[in-house]
Amino acid sequence: MMQSSKWNAMSLLMDEKTKQAEVLRTAIDEADAIVIGIGAGMSASDGFTYVGERFTENFPDFIEKYRFFDMLQASLHPYGSWQEYWAFESRFITLNYLDQPVGQSYLALKSLVEGKQYHIITTNADNAFDAAEYDMTHVFHIQGEYILQQCSQHCHAQTYRNDDLIRKMVVAQQDMLIPWEMIPRCPKCDAPMEVNKRKAEVGMVEDAEFHAQLQRYNAFLEQHQDDKVLYLEIGIGYTTPQFVKHPFQRMTRKNENAIYMTMNKKAYRIPNSIQERTIHLTEDISTLITTALRNDSTTQNNNIGETEDVLNRTD
């Protein structure tokens, strides 16, 4: 029987003086492959939250009318007309995709895994990876993307993008309604278009690009299923555990060479079968990732200026 791999990162946990950033850095360095699951907690750590001033300053009229608690509740609301639906969604997409700046934790993570075998699955639908200029062949958007549109009747498997129309909707809307003629229409059946995001009842349109992303992700998992794999879960809650949390735990259990690492202030239940191969990091996600990059002795010794450029980007 093959002996399971030894992880120095697990040993570091035994030392109370060890910083969490060092544990993260060590695990990334020693992994043969890294499967990264990213949820809303990572974008929120960069300040891209769905609550507070970011919500109240951009949607005061919707809050007054519907008493919404946050943007998530507002985005799931069954609006009475397509004019109102697109009045909200056009503002939401502009804020959370078209105009959302680059996140510092995404830049730092990209540098941390540079040169490693890695693949990302994300339940986020914002622009974070595009803004940070990731190689998108390593990213799988399992929940869709805000900028994409699909037929509301799901009459065909194709998504569409029209940035200019979204911006025009924001400018033209009045009293929480866009002009009737601006409602995007399906080119096949003429039904109104909607945002390409997964719904519990009907799912979402999964086009050729979606399936290409899925195929690349599955191929990576299969290629490294027995390797020394770090299953790194960042900012994932329990809203949709079937996409990241449960598969990561299951793959860790099946591969004795793997460890499961979660970055989350909340402590969710860990199956008994993998508790001894689980690392739970509780510090602020953005701070933890950027600190791990700064503490990378190789990066600091070889190219200090490049590291500082990554962490200081604001475009």
From Swiss-Prot:
Enzyme class, spelled out: transferase
Ranges in a coiled coil: none
Family classification: Belongs to the sirtuin family. Class M subfamily.
Binding residues for Zn(2+): C151, C155, C186, C189
All copies of domain Deacetylase sirtuin-type, residue ranges: 13-299
Note: The SirTM-mediated ADP-ribosylation can be specifically reversed by the Macro domain-containing protein encoded by the same operon (SAV0325).
Necessary cofactors: Zn(2+)
Catalytic activity: L-aspartyl-[protein] + NAD(+) = 4-O-(ADP-D-ribosyl)-L-aspartyl-[protein] + nicotinamide
Protein's UniProt name: Protein ADP-ribosyltransferase
Effect of N124A: Loss of catalytic activity
Manner of cofactor binding, per the entry note: Binds 1 zinc ion per subunit.
Keyword annotations from UniProtKB, A to Z: Glycosyltransferase, Metal-binding, NAD, Nucleotidyltransferase, Transferase, Zinc
A molecular-function term among this protein's GO annotations: metal ion binding
Native species: Staphylococcus aureus (strain Mu50 / ATCC 700699)
Mechanisms controlling activity: Is inhibited by Tenovin-6 in vitro, but not by nicotinamide.
EC number: 2.4.2.-
Binding-site residues, NAD(+): A40, T123, N124, A125, D126, Q143, Y238, T239, T240, N264, Y268, I285
Function: Catalyzes specifically the mono-ADP-ribosylation of GcvH-L (SAV0324). This activity is dependent on prior lipoylation of the target protein. May be involved in the modulation of the response to host-derived oxidative stress. In contrast to other sirtuin classes, lacks protein deacylase activity, being unable to catalyze delipoylation, debiotinylation, deacetylation and desuccinylation of proteins.
